[in-house]
């Protein structure tokens, strides 16, 4: 699966960014511009602004395995950064394939909490018929109306319109399959998310509506990771304040040996 964005040469330490749902790698555009790091890769999850491979079930384990395979292709250990479900796949990869990373950053550490509870949107998507009805309505709505949902959660207008414009049937079907595979994600992935050898950073936005700070903090402690609180920012922190997001990453990476 191709990276959407890439700069620099593969001889340098690579930073790999993984988006969430319903998103594309474009969520990282502003942050990467502010970061100005010489070698970055922003991956496109299968089925999200890219084709869904034949036979790909879009389950949480298949996506995590897919990410591990992408990192293997890069060769050397990477600085891995994930948001939303991308952050969840980071949780899984550093738990099962820690040799693939030099460091890791996630805003979805709660998926590695054995007591994790899903948010209301997830529960709809995990429910047969209700999930299909939700996405049927979204796909039938004008792009501007879909963008309004993102704006309700703090996304500025232009990136909200971009996010909304990329939602399609393939993406919706992948989201349904992903969430239905992950009803018990905390109990399945949580036990392995402990004492991760590579340095980690868990980002905790104060206005995050989909994952509790308590769950993220508890999971970070079990994984031996640091935490970074982002006051005043929400789920799409990298779109709300790209410069601040880049500064947090630079500060963390500066501590690595």
Model-derived features: positions:
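Short beta-strand element of the alpha/beta-hydrolase
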Residues: 14-19
């Amino acid at each position: 699966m191709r990276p959407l964005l890439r700069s620099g040469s593969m001889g340098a330490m690579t930073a790999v960014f993984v988006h969430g749902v319903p998103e594309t790698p474009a969520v990282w555009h502003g942050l990467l511009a502010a970061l100005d790091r010489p070698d970055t890769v922003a991956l496109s999850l299968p089925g999200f602004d890219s084709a869904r491979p034949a036979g790909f079930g879009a389950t949480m384990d298949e996506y995590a395995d897919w990410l591990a395979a992408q990192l293997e292709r890069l060769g050397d250990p990477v600085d891995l950064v994930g948001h939303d479900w991308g952050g969840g796949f980071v949780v899984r990869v550093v738990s099962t394939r820690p040799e693939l990373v030099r460091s890791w950053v996630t805003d979805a550490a709660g998926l590695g909490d054995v007591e994790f509870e899903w948010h209301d949107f997830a529960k709809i998507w995990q429910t047969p018929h209700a999930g299909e009805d939700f996405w049927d309505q979204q796909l039938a709505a004008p792009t501007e109306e879909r963008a309004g949902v993102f704006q309700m959660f703090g996304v500025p207008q232009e990136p909200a319109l971009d996010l909304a414009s990329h939602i399609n049937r393939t993406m919706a079907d992948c989201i349904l399959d992903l969430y239905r595979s992950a009803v018990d994600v905390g109990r399945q992935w949580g036990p392995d998310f402990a004492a991760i050898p590579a340095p980690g950073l868990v980002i905790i936005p104060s206005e995050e509506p989909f994952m509790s700070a308590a769950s993220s903090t508890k999971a970070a402690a079990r994984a031996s990771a640091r935490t970074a609180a982002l006051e005043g920012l929400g789920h799409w922190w990298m779109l709300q304040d790209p410069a601040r997001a880049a500064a947090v990453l630079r500060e963390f990476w500066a501590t690595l040996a």
